[in-house]
């Protein structure tokens, strides 16, 4: 599928409808997803944003996948997207849920600038972008335990990810990790980290998305409830997190 505007808009509406997410799109949002795709493909060589460049696969693997989070987030929630990279899930989520307040965080200034400029181009006033390491943000009083949710997509293995994300989540909030096929194994090894960092109940949901002509997209979505405050000693410096995971 070439990036033809009419064909793209038809395809994204078809795929969202097929996966029970038709209510997330309207004419304006469909056109903004087209503009997002156009910009991402144009800037891909400069920023190394995605290995997926076929529009139909972008719709399934990036847009529909990120939109699955929309139904799980309470109205008006504050979210920090840890390691936002190319803007996933930040940009699709901000498009389908304009009530959310999303902070896109990454340690790479070049990528943060791309996400910021793209959000501005799309008129997404509910996105704020910051250059920071998650372990530094977790020690910053203006961000520590301030968010309803922390999201992460393909950032790190679970023990490391918990130490980067849970300190940013307020008590009663949730960390939501979009993980790959090793998630259950990683999760089994992260029980101690979850407990130490203030996490509680863990929920694993299998996300399965289809478009009718490519292989279905299937991966686990892990939600961890924040039950108590994270001890002040966490998060540690990244060298310690990497060398001695909890």
Predicted features, each with a name:
Residues 2-4, 11-76, 80, 113, ...:
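Class I SAM-dependent transferase core
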Residues 111-113, 183, 187:
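Short alpha-helix immediately C-terminal to the canonical SAM-binding loop
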Residues 135, 180-184, 209:
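Short "lid" loop at the C-terminus of a central beta-strand within the Rossmann-like core
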Residues 53, 131-133, 206:
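Short loop/edge segments at beta-strand edges and connector loops
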């Amino acid at each position: 599928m070439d990036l033809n505007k009419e064909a793209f808009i038809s395809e994204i509406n078809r795929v969202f409808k097929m996966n029970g997410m038709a209510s997330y799109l309207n004419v304006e949002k469909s056109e903004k997803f087209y503009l997002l795709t156009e910009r991402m493909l144009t800037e891909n060589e400069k920023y190394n944003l995605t290995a997926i460049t076929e529009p139909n696969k972008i719709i399934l693997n990036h847009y529909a996948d990120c939109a699955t989070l929309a139904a799980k987030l309470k109205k008006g929630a504050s979210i920090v997207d840890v390691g936002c990279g190319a803007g996933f899930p930040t940009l699709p989520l901000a498009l389908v849920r304009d009530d959310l307040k999303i902070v896109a965080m990454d340690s790479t200034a070049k990528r943060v600038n791309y996400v910021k400029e793209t959000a501005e181009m799309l008129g997404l006033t509910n996105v704020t972008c910051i250059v920071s390491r998650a372990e530094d943000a977790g020690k910053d009083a203006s961000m520590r335990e301030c968010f309803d949710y922390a999201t992460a997509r393909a950032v790190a293995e679970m023990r490391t990810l918990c130490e980067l994300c849970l300190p940013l989540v307020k008590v009663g909030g949730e960390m939501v990790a979009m993980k790959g096929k090793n998630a259950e194994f990683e999760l089994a090894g992260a029980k101690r980290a979850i407990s130490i960092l203030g996490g509680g109940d863990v929920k694993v949901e299998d996300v399965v998305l289809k478009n009718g002509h490519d292989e279905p997209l299937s991966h686990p979505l892990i939600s961890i409830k924040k039950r108590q405050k994270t001890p002040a000693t966490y998060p540690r410096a990244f060298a310690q997190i990497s060398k001695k995971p909890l």
